[in-house]
Amino acid sequence: MTLYMDVHNIDGGVALKDVAQAHMADLQTQDQYGVRYLRYWVDEANGKVFCLIDSPDADAANRVHREAHGLVAQEIYPVEEGD
């Protein structure tokens, strides 16, 4: 599996509580696709959400988002964890 960081750009800003609810929906859906949603970060004022995902591929990570709540990422990058 590969670590990915995805980026969501949400016009008009985003509330942390709404992202928390979406993350819970991801957790309920992730096993169907062999994906693990690990963490997320939110920039409420600028409408940015960043998710750290352990996934077989980028498409599987976005499929979870699509099925769980419909908010797919606009960008997704493979990343490596540093020491």
Tell where the protein language model's regions lie, with residue ranges:
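Short hydrophobic/aromatic beta-strand micro-patches
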Residues: 9, 52-54
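An amphipathic, aromatic/His-enriched active-site/gating alpha helix that lines ligand/cofactor pockets
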Residues: 56-82
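Functionally engaged cysteine thiol sites
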Residues: 29, 51, 65
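Short S/T/G/P-rich N-terminal loop/turn motif that feeds into the first structured element of a domain
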Residues: 1-32, 36-38, 42-47, 81-83
